[in-house]
């Protein structure tokens, strides 16, 4: 089983139900048709469990029973495609999810209501990854998570959602669409936290640490003392930078996530990165804490 499939199965197992998640799946994998009775909706996926999930979301929110169909593609290893087909209440569903404009080509981005709400943003990113997301196996040592969109506007909207959670998301246009991607291991782990894939995040971090340990084995024998010295030096440097920010622009002007880390660092200068991570109001990896401390240092350097 690929790591991408593991992540998607964990997300499906969360049992969450969100219209924002459904909106992302419909926008990225849905298509409209016209029949005598009105509009029809077809949502395609190569994952049977995702098809069932879509069926359950439609039933739960709109009390409609869709059809799950499948057909075979030729000359492909993964050649079964599932289609969730619906021919009732389609116009009402599109209107409720604010998708009608997007389907007719007027609006290609993401609903501003989703962009402005944390929980809706998390759910939308979860749906986007379920629909068109993939990531490299951390065993490869090459870290990349990407989500493919048809339109650049939508890819940029996904990047904005990720940046809302301090992820360094970028976009690129390719022949078959636009891609929103993350390349830093810390950002990928934080993304997994954002969408709720905690087990996958823990496995990713464990594999990453194991690889780093193997690669650094020759240096590890004499690293303990040096690491302690570096930790103390880094802690004092960060504290000095936090004081600098407090005396100039003020900590209250930092993003909430950075404010919390800054207060912890100043109040507990002896804390290790792991202790800082454990003390945060929301779970975060050691790498994620380091990522935020680097951002604080960068802000101070620019003052």
From Swiss-Prot:
Annotated DNA-binding ranges?
272-303
Q: Is DNA-binding one of the keywords?
A: yes
Domain of life, per lineage: Bacteria
Query: Which positions carry the signal peptide feature in this UniProt record?
Result: none
Q: InterPro entries recorded for this chain?
A: Homing_endonucl, Sporu_reg_WhiA_N_dom, Sporulation_regulator_WhiA, Sporulation_regulator_WhiA_C, WhiA_LAGLIDADG_dom
Recorded hits in SUPFAM superfamilies, A to Z, give:
Homing endonucleases (SSF55608)
Q: Which GO terms describe its molecular function?
A: DNA binding
| GO biological process terms held by the UniProt record | cell division; regulation of sporulation
The protein's UniProt keywords, in alphabetical order, are: Cell cycle, Cell division, DNA-binding
Gene3D superfamilies this protein is in? Homing endonucleases (3.10.28.10)
Tell me, in a sentence or two, what this protein's role is.
Answer: Involved in cell division and chromosome segregation.
Q: Which family does it belong to?
A: Belongs to the WhiA family.
The name of this protein is Probable cell division protein WhiA
> Which species is the source of this protein?
Streptococcus gordonii (strain Challis / ATCC 35105 / BCRC 15272 / CH1 / DL1 / V288)
Question: What gene is it encoded by?
Answer: whiA
């Amino acid at each position: 089983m690929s790591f991408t499939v593991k992540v998607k199965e964990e997300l499906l197992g969360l049992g969450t139900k969100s219209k924002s998640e459904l909106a992302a799946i419909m926008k990225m994998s849905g298509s409209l048709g016209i029949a005598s009775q009105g509009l029809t909706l077809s949502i395609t996926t190569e994952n049977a469990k995702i098809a069932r999930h879509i069926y359950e979301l439609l039933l739960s929110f709109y009390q409609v029973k869709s059809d799950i169909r499948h057909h075979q593609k030729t000359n492909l290893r993964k050649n079964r495609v599932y289609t969730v087909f619906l021919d009732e209440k389609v116009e009402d569903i599109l209107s409720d999810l604010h998708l009608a404009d997007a389907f007719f080509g007027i609006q290609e981005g993401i609903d501003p209501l989703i962009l402005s709400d944390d929980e809706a943003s998390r759910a939308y990113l979860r749906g986007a990854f379920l629909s068109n997301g993939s990531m490299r196996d951390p065993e490869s040592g090459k870290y990349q998570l990407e989500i493919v969109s048809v339109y650049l506007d939508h890819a940029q909207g996904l990047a904005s959602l990720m940046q809302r959670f301090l992820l360094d998301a970028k976009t690129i246009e390719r022949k078959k669409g636009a891609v929103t991607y993350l390349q830093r291991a810390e950002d990928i782990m934080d993304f997994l936290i954002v969408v709720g894939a905690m087990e996958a995040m823990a496995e990713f971090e464990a594999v990453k640490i194991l690889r780093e340990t193997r690669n650094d084995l020759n240096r590890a024998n004499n690293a303990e003392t040096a690491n302690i010295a570096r930790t103390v030096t880094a802690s004092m440097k960060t504290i000095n930078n936090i004081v600098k920010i407090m005396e100039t622009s003020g900590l209250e002007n930092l993003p909430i996530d950075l404010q919390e880390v800054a207060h912890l660092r100043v109040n507990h200068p002896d804390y290790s990165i792991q202790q800082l991570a454990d003390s945060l109001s929301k779970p975060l990896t050691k790498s994620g804490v380091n990522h935020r401390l680097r951002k604080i240092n960068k802000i101070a350097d620019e003052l």
